[in-house]
C-alpha cells in the first residue's frame, strides 16, 4: 500500500490531529517556542565557546528567565561549565509612558504589570547555584548606566522582549559595547505592528543597524509566532 492510499484510508486520523492542534492555545505554543529558542541560543553559544552574560529585557513573570537558568545548567553538564551569569531588566509596572508611535491595542500597562515580590521569589527558588541579578526600574533610568556597572563584561545571549520600539532601542544601545562575535540576540515580538518596518522591535533593530554599520548580523533562526534570532558575525 503506497503512502497516498494510506493517507486516504486513515483520513480520520488527520481529522483528529487537526482538531487537537487547532485547540492548542497559541500562547502555549508561543511559550514553548520561546523556551526552545533560548535553549538553542545557549547551546550554540556554548558549543562555539561564546561566553558571557545572558541578558533579558522584559522578564515579566520570570518564566523564560527561570527556563534560561535551567537550560544552561543542563547544557553545562553536556558541554562543560560556561560560568554564565543572568541579568534581567523589568519595571514590573508595565510600560509607563508610551509614545504615540508605540501605541498598540495589546501593549497596555494593566496587561504587563506584575507582582515583583512573587516574581523574584520564584526566580530565587529556581536559581539553584546560578548567578543572577534582577534590575528593577524603567529602562530610561536603569539603562542609562553602563553594562559594567551591573558587572556585565560580554553578552552571550540577549533576549529582547520589550514589545515597543523605544524600549527595544534603549536595550540595544545599552548592550552595544558588550556585543561580541557570536552573541545571539532574540527578538520575541519581531513581526508585530502589522510588519511596519519603523515600529516595534523590528523598527528598533533596523535603526540600530543603520547607526552601527560596523556591526554585522546574520539571521540565525525563527521561532514562535513571528519571533526571530540573529547572531553577531562581525564587530
Label the predicted regions.
Residues 1-31:
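Membrane-proximal basic amphipathic "stem/tether" segments
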Residues 19-29, 48-235:
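S-adenosylmethionine/decaboxylated-SAM
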Residues 33-36, 63:
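Aromatic- and histidine-enriched alpha-helix N-cap/loop-to-helix transition segments
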Residues 36-49:
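Conserved alpha-helix/loop element of class I SAM-dependent methyltransferases that forms part
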Amino acid at each position: 500500500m503506497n503512502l497516498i492510499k494510506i493517507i486516504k484510508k486513515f483520513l480520520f486520523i488527520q481529522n483528529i490531529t487537526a482538531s487537537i492542534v487547532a485547540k492548542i492555545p497559541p500562547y502555549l505554543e508561543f511559550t514553548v517556542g520561546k523556551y526552545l529558542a533560548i535553549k538553542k541560543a545557549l547551546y550554540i553559544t556554548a558549543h562555539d565557546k561564546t561566553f558571557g552574560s545572558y541578558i533579558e529585557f522584559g522578564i515579566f513573570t520570570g518564566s523564560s528567565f527561570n527556563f534560561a537558568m535551567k537550560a544552561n545548567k543542563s547544557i553545562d553538564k553536556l558541554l562543560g561549565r560556561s560560568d554564565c551569569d543572568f541579568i534581567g531588566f523589568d519595571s514590573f509596572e508595565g510600560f509607563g509612558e508610551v509614545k504615540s508611535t508605540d501605541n498598540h491595542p495589546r501593549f497596555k500597562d494593566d496587561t504587563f504589570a506584575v507582582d515583583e515580590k512573587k516574581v523574584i521569589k520564584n526566580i530565587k527558588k529556581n536559581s539553584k547555584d546560578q548567578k543572577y541579578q534582577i534590575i528593577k526600574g524603567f529602562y530610561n533610568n536603569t539603562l542609562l548606566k553602563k553594562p559594567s556597572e551591573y558587572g556585565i563584561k560580554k553578552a552571550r545571549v540577549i533576549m529582547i522582549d520589550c514589545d515597543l520600539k523605544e524600549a527595544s532601542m534603549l536595550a540595544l544601545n545599552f548592550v552595544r559595547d558588550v556585543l561580541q562575535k557570536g552573541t545571539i540576540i532574540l527578538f520575541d515580538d519581531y513581526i508585530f505592528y502589522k510588519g511596519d518596518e519603523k515600529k516595534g522591535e523590528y523598527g528598533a533593530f533596523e535603526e540600530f543597524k543603520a547607526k552601527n554599520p560596523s556591526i554585522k548580523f546574520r539571521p540565525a533562526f525563527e521561532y514562535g509566532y513571528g519571533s526571530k534570532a540573529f547572531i553577531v558575525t562581525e564587530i
